[in-house]
From Swiss-Prot:
Annotated source species: Gallus gallus (Chicken)
DNA-binding region per UniProt: 200-259
Protein name (Swiss-Prot/TrEMBL): Homeobox protein engrailed-2
The organism's place on the tree of life at top rank: Eukaryota
Family per similarity comment: Belongs to the engrailed homeobox family.
Length: 289
């Protein structure tokens, strides 16, 4: 038999001995693969990790063992806090926790922008060691610029989602004594003038003796003037209607304070203990006030 010729039994046994590692261009490799999948030039090597449920649930998962410590030695609670954050970053060749899932290497598209890369980024920022960050990112095939872009896009997406939600008002807005509407808000006081002008106040009316005598006589007749009677008095005394009206109001208030008589509503409220504003009359006031 010639050297180039092979029996069918040898050709069938050759793929089993090689374990499927034939060249990509060979016809035998193409026949073994499904028709839809292209041949992979460099398949990912199978990596054994400790990502079991029991290991993940342990408190020491993801922490590197302390130098000089044994597996059976109990961990001290203050030992982890004394280590620097830069020591938590893995070496360039070491496997990064969280990158692979339960089946080994994991997909590259899923692990590039995952939470493990963000955790590495934050740990290196706190530790202030950019070299450790770059080494860890290169081990995962990710650069710092891509990580920053992905984190910015995540933050912008979170901001847009928050903007779509209706704005919620805090509870204290609805508990104010001003109003239950948030649009009203707290009332602002008007600023007081430092130098009040005398023109802002209403000028006091200086009644003559004849005018006072006529007003007192009219008050004895009727304490409440009608509009026609007020107009006629204003024409007779040469005063404004507002001046006569204010004088009658002040006169009634003085008599009410002097006598101490209260209306029926005040008496009813005082009986219930809701009103007890006692007033005293002040002497020495002239009638011109």
């Amino acid at each position: 038999m010639e050297e180039g010729g092979r029996s069918p039994r040898e050709e069938a046994a050759e793929p089993q001995e090689s374990g499927g590692d034939a060249e990509p261009g060979g016809g035998r490799r193409a026949l073994l693969l499904p028709p839809g999948d292209p041949p992979h030039p460099h398949p990912h090597p199978h990596r054994i990790t400790n990502f079991f449920i029991d290991n993940i649930l342990r408190p020491e998962f993801g922490r590197r063992k302390e130098a000089g410590g044994t597996a059976g030695e109990p961990r001290r609670p203050g030992a982890e806090s004394r280590r620097s954050p830069a020591a938590a970053a893995p070496a360039p060749g070491a496997p990064v926790p969280g990158g692979g899932g339960g089946g080994g290497g994991g997909s590259p598209g899923r692990g590039e922008g995952g939470p493990a890369a963000l955790a590495l980024h934050g740990a290196a920022k706190k530790g202030g060691d950019p070299a450790a960050l770059e080494a860890a990112l290169k081990a995962r095939g990710l650069s710092g610029a891509e990580l920053s872009v992905s984190s910015d896009s995540d933050s912008s997406q979170a901001g847009s989602n928050a903007g779509n939600q209706p704005m919620l008002w805090p509870a204290w807005v609805y508990c104010t004594r001003y109003s239950d509407r948030p649009s009203s808000g707290p009332r602002s006081r008007k600023p007081k003038k430092k130098n009040p002008n005398k023109e802002d106040k209403r000028p006091r009316t200086a009644f003559t003796a004849e005018q006072l005598q006529r007003l007192k006589a009219e008050f004895q007749t009727n304490r409440y003037l009608t509009e026609q009677r007020r107009q006629s008095l204003a024409q007779e005394l040469g005063l404004n209607e507002s001046q006569i009206k204010i004088w009658f109001q002040n006169k009634r208030a003085k008599i009410k304070k002097a006598t101490g008589s209260k209306n029926s509503l005040a008496v009813h409220l005082m009986a219930q203990g809701l009103y007890n504003h006692s007033t005293t009359a002040k002497d020495g006031k002239s009638d011109s006030e």
